[in-house]
Amino acid sequence: QSLDFGNYLHASLHRFGSVLGKENKQWRDATDEDIENLSSKIASSIAPRVRYGALHSDAASRYTENALNKTFKNTLSSLREWSKSSSFDTKALEHKFFLHLRAENGETFTLNGKIDRVDMLGENVAVYDYKTGHTTASLVEIVSGLKLQLLTYLLGLMEEADGNPLLPAALMYIYLSGDVKIVSSVPRNGIPDLPAKDGASGFITSSGATVYDLDSRAGSNDSILPVRMKNDGDPYNTGNVLSKEDFDHLLRIVKKRIIMLYEEMISGRIDIRPVRFKGSSPCKYCPYHSICRFDPSRREENYDYIHAVSDKDMKRELPGIAFDMTKPRKEDDNG
């Protein structure tokens, strides 16, 4: 199977984490020697699969491979430093989950998937998804059904817990530097031009104590967490900082949204009405325009517009949205 650079980093990272797990080690336990030796071993086994062996084709390609491997090592070092500052332990990598749901008509269906990484401290859970692009998710995108991934993962973990309490601590995309470029020739100095420091985006608990458990450096430039801390030890109430009640509302909304999407699919609804959000549409990347022939200039065809709302404003709307979406449907007046 051919891999692109992003998948290369993703696969390498998972393999490194799996090796640590088999040795009952956490990221913080990895030594410099572990990172050097294991990363080289992993890279040599995965690199031939990148773009059908393109990294071994000539000197410039081997230079690109060297840059990619250095990026991988830098990512490992960054994750290790974060782990040293965290009280959470990684409990699972590529964790499979099965979410069992029931539609309004009584039909049941199962949604399954795989979570890149699950960290825990007691009943506190953090869900992480590795991304090579700078993926983000706003609350309005989640509520409207555009970005359901992280909350769906949390729903799956909640079901597995089978009634045992789980407190969401973080739902985050962790960025991997997958933007190493193929070069046509080796630069004169031979030194790889590496991407900037990795970061993260997502949603964090409003509990200051838990935030510092996630990363004792929270609020500093060294922390990976997308959060700012106040002098009293609590995070600033920005749009991505959520209370337990906020998470509960989102889980109810996302669960209902998934059920609604299922019901639309089984009912045969195939409206050609692509979403448009912040001036962008999936049509930009879709290879099937010649089949659907969507044309917004025609009166009978139009986009499904999603209006941008700030996370801070959206948080205030969550209780009402959760209530409206999950209240029992009224019976038809004609019986």
Give a label for each model feature.
Residues Q1-G335:
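Structural signature of nuclease core domains in nucleic-acid processing machines
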